[in-house]
Amino acid sequence: MYKEINCRRIVPGIGTGKALVTKDVINFLAMVDTKSATIIDRNHELFGRSIKDIVLVFPNAVGSSVGAYAIYSLRINQVTPAAIICMNNADIITASGCAISDIPLVDMLEKLSSFILESEMEISVNADKEVVTIKTV
């Protein structure tokens, strides 16, 4: 069974993978090892987890505009997320980083009051059609 949720496209594209969900913001420059795509901040909920080939679900990024280049470094090192979902409005760091790295990015998911995204759920982000599809049990 699948559940579709409408969203807003920020960066076009399609990405599919297991969700990695956090309520913590991410500073891509300070918290992510751009060679391995691993969260290296010991105080972060996702410490030790890789964001490679997954659908990253988080509120938004924080930090300086250099964070966009940290996201681009993930692309150079071939360790990008399959797609990113910002649970808040997408911020300029994430939007510009995803744009230069060709990572699908969406925000403003509808219907989340009745549905909770959890890590390990299979998610497909189709930013082109502005829809997120979640495989449910």
Where are these regions (language model features)?
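Feature captures the catalytic cores and cofactor-binding loops of soluble hydro-lyases/lyases
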Residues: 4-13, 20-131
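Short beta-strand-to-coil "C-cap" segments at the C-terminal boundary of structured domains/repeats
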Residues: 133-137
